[in-house]
Amino acid sequence: MAFLMKKKKFKFQTTFTLEELTAVPFVNGVLFCKVRLLDGGDFVSLSSREEVQENCVRWRKRFTFVCKMSANPATGLLDPCIFRVSVRKELKGGKAYSKLGFTDLNLAEFAGSGSTVRCCLLEGYDTKNTRQDNSILKVTIGMFLLSGDPCFKTPPSTAKSISIPGQDSSLQLTCKGGGTSSGGSSSTNSLTGSRPPKTRPTILGSGLPEEPDQSLSSPEEVFHSGHSRNSSYASQQSKLSGYSTEHSRSSSLSDLTHRRNTSTSSSASGGLSMAVEGPEGMEREHRPSEKPPRPPEKPPRPPRPLHLSDRSFRRKKDSVESHPTWVDDTRIDADDIVEKIMQSQDFTDGSNTEDSNLRLFVSRDGSTTLSGIQLGNRVSSGVYEPVVIESH
């Protein structure tokens, strides 16, 4: 029975990509990395030498190698396989280097998981001046099984989940996928342990919630009871456009909504009873007739609601016009001033007392003057002489 205790052997094709090193506390410098397998092989390699730019170094270097692992035959748990990445800095023009830090990765955690991205903090070789506690190394690891039993177990991951500030854990979805049938919803509720969703009351065209009919016990009875229009076209459009509920109520008052009245007397007599609700809440019952009733016509499409900015501007304008401010009370009205000036003026015809035309007078010394009938006495005394200008 000794062969049963022999460990299982595995071979994995490993693809290791050295992405970048961030939060480097150097403004300039040349960094490179040395990667090697501590367990499961003798792979050793060096990355390219890159300069520090904006406290970050990007290599984008890809390494491919074969990694050997073993597992416990009883549990199938893979044994640790350590892969070390050492970050180093060039000194003396590349002739020497200094070790900045390293990180150890257990490749057994990534076995058979495809491509995985991991960010690691660098660990310092000593505690003096070469520790880079805040530098973060980003790598990508992909492992594919080449040989061995495909049934194995990976050790628990050592990665730490970082919670984002301001994100509520209750916002995460508890279940994926959702069926529309009642069976799917009941199974989902039983798995998640949540209460079944409550049935919301139907909103009528008048904006009032309609209570569910107690006389209809099964979905077949609800389906065969007839046509029922719960909401008007305007209310449906307002829900799609995000319009307010108050406007949908007021706009749907003009539409008449028909609802099947399933009373005990009508179901017993076998007749068809229709209840019509108007804006005032009045109901009129139509007596059963021999001819089957025609389906109600589709109401005309209501006008398209205004844009939100137009509505707010109109509401603001109406409020300003209806409510005068203290500036309007203290300001002098220009129309009142113009009206007072017009009333104080005399616009009667005064041509009977004054001469409508002006005349030019020249005196003996050469002085001139313009006047009407006021200079008549001076003209008669010979002080001024009238001048007559004739057109040539």
From Swiss-Prot:
<dbReference type="InterPro" id="IPR019448">
    <property type="entry name" value="NT-C2"/>
</dbReference>
<dbReference type="GO" id="GO:0045672">
    <property type="term" value="P:positive regulation of osteoclast differentiation"/>
</dbReference>
<feature type="compositionally biased region" description="Basic and acidic residues">
    <location>
        <begin position="307"/>
        <end position="324"/>
    </location>
</feature>
<keyword id="KW-0539">Nucleus</keyword>
<dbReference type="GO" id="GO:0005737">
    <property type="term" value="C:cytoplasm"/>
</dbReference>
<keyword id="KW-0472">Membrane</keyword>
<feature type="compositionally biased region" description="Low complexity">
    <location>
        <begin position="183"/>
        <end position="194"/>
    </location>
</feature>
<dbReference type="InterPro" id="IPR039931">
    <property type="entry name" value="EEIG1/2-like"/>
</dbReference>
<comment type="function">
    <text>Key component of TNFSF11/RANKL- and TNF-induced osteoclastogenesis pathways, thereby mediates bone resorption in pathological bone loss conditions. Required for TNFSF11/RANKL-induced osteoclastogenesis via its interaction with TNFRSF11A/RANK, thereby facilitates the downsteam transcription of NFATC1 and activation of PLCG2. Facilitates recruitment of the transcriptional repressor PRDM1/BLIMP1 to the promoter of the anti-osteoclastogenesis gene IRF8, thereby resulting in transcription of osteoclast differentiation factors. May play a role in estrogen action.</text>
</comment>
<keyword id="KW-0963">Cytoplasm</keyword>
<feature type="compositionally biased region" description="Basic and acidic residues">
    <location>
        <begin position="281"/>
        <end position="300"/>
    </location>
</feature>
<feature type="domain" description="C2 NT-type">
    <location>
        <begin position="2"/>
        <end position="145"/>
    </location>
</feature>
<feature type="compositionally biased region" description="Polar residues">
    <location>
        <begin position="228"/>
        <end position="255"/>
    </location>
</feature>
<feature type="compositionally biased region" description="Low complexity">
    <location>
        <begin position="262"/>
        <end position="273"/>
    </location>
</feature>
<dbReference type="GO" id="GO:0005634">
    <property type="term" value="C:nucleus"/>
</dbReference>
<dbReference type="Pfam" id="PF10358">
    <property type="entry name" value="NT-C2"/>
</dbReference>
<dbReference type="GO" id="GO:0045121">
    <property type="term" value="C:membrane raft"/>
</dbReference>
<protein>
    <recommendedName>
        <fullName>Early estrogen-induced gene 1 protein</fullName>
    </recommendedName>
</protein>
<feature type="region of interest" description="Required for interaction with TNFRSF11A/RANK">
    <location>
        <begin position="129"/>
        <end position="138"/>
    </location>
</feature>
<comment type="subunit">
    <text>Part of a complex composed of EEIG1, TNFRSF11A/RANK, PLCG2, GAB2, TEC and BTK; complex formation increases in the presence of TNFSF11/RANKL. Interacts with PRDM1/BLIMP1; following TNFSF11/RANKL stimulation in bone marrow-derived macrophages, the interaction promotes the binding of PRDM1/BLIMP1 to the gene promoter of IRF8. Interacts (via N-terminus) with TNFRSF11A/RANK (via cytoplasmic domain); when in the presence of TNFSF11/RANKL.</text>
</comment>
<feature type="region of interest" description="Disordered">
    <location>
        <begin position="173"/>
        <end position="324"/>
    </location>
</feature>
<comment type="similarity">
    <text>Belongs to the EEIG family.</text>
</comment>
